[in-house]
Every structure is written in C-alpha cells, then in structure tokens.
Amino acid sequence: MTIRDTNHSMSVKRRNPWNWIPTLYFAEGLPYVAVMTIAVIMYKRLGLSNTEITLYTSWLYLPWTIKPLWSPFVDLVKTKRSWIIAMQGLIAAGFAGIAFFIPTTHFVQLTLAFFWLMAFSSATHDIAADGFYMLGLNNKEQSFFVGIRNTFYRFANIFGQGILVMLAGWLETSQGNIPLAWSITFYLMAGLFLALTLYHRFILPHPDTDIKREGLTASKLLEDFLKTFISCLLYTSPSPRDA
C-alpha cells in the first residue's frame, strides 16, 4: 500500500464498500432505465402513438448529455454525500408523482413533468456518486470495485426492463386496469427508492475529503463552467476527418 493509499484510508470513516457500492450504483442505474425505457413502454400501453411518444420522450436524455455543465455547482454547494441523499429523495418523489398522476385526465403532461424531475435529479446523482466513489475508496479498492459497480448498474437495467415491466404486465392482466397497473408499479419503485435513500443516509461513509469547495468565487465558478462547456463542445464536435 502506498503512502497516499494509507493517508486516504485514514481520512475515511470506514464502511465496508460491499455495504454501499452495489446499492449506490443500482440506485444510479434504475432512474435512467425508468426514464429512457420504462416511460416509453408505459406511454405505449396507455394508448399513445409512436409519434406522440417520440415527441414527448426524445428530449428526456438531455440532462445526462449536458450534466458536465453544472458539475461545478455540485462542488460548490454541500458535500457529494449530501447531494446523493437529496437526489435519491427527489427521485423517490418523482416515482411517486408519476404513480399518482397516471390515472388522471392530464396524465401525459403531469407524468412528463416528473420524468423531467427524475432525469435532472438522476444526472446530478451520477455526478455526486461518481465523485463520492473516488473519495470513499483508496486506489486499490477503486480498481477492484470498477467491475462491481458496473455489474450492479447493469443489473438495475435488467431489473427495470425485465422484472418491473413483467410486473406491470402481470398487474394489467390480473387487475384488468392498465393505468392502475402502472400506477402500482411506480408506487413500488417509489417505495424501493425511498428505502435506498434511508439506507444510504445511514450506511454511506463520511470521507474527510468530501467537503464543499471553500473560497470558490463567482469568477472562478464561471471559469470552471466555461472550461467544461468548451470541453463538451470539443468532445462532441466532429473532426475534419469525420466531416
């Protein structure tokens, strides 16, 4: 173990990484699959046409695309641990809001508003969780748990696209009421995410290095924002060879 790893491990109020890495990255993957995949299936079952679904859901991916633009603000306000807990709470509220408004007359507009809330909350959660991963583990642990976190992120995708969609289908058949079936499914997701929020509230470690950036001025924040914005443009712009 290097001196850096030793100092790092001493600066973290220890928790066994197995107690929080799997659930943290499951919580990172589930809202993404809910917004990008389950929403499409749900709207189709609720009678929307393919054209309407494309129109309403095609922009929901935007928060994950532009999330680097507000990543400096995550460092400015509170700790990454606080952001994780807060965003998971908002995601749970998003699931509950969708569940509540599915049976209503204006369900499309109202549920879309909560899907947008979930999308921005989930993208912000990604920023905080990935940063917290670096703070909560030493170098050796970071290398070891890369595969673990990816596995549970993918498991969240399988759980969402497979088990939850199957559950909604079974409820449609057993209840004979499509809106009710999907409402129950989203209430269950809200309950699951609330449980994850409460669990992480107590189980996530408290790294001493997880602090908000002190002395960050408006000019420095603007500089970081512009650097990030330019980096995004350079990354997404086609090269002359691609043109």
Residue spans of the language-model regions?
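Glycine-rich segments within core transmembrane alpha-helices of 12-TM secondary carriers
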Residues: 147-164
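Single conserved hydrophobic/aromatic residue that forms the stacking wall/gate
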Residues: 235-243
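C-terminal ends and interior cores of transmembrane alpha-helices
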Residues: 89-105
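Juxtamembrane intracellular "pre-TM" segments in multi-pass secondary transporters
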Residues: 5-14, 208-234
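Helix-loop boundary and gating motifs at the non-cytosolic
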Residues: 12-60, 241
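Cytoplasmic membrane-interface "Motif A"-like loop-to-helix N-cap segments
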Residues: 76-88
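Transmembrane alpha-helix termini and helix-breaking/packing motifs in multi-pass membrane transporters
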Residues: 159-179
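C-terminal membrane-cytosol helix-exit motif in multi-pass small-molecule transporters
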Residues: 191-209
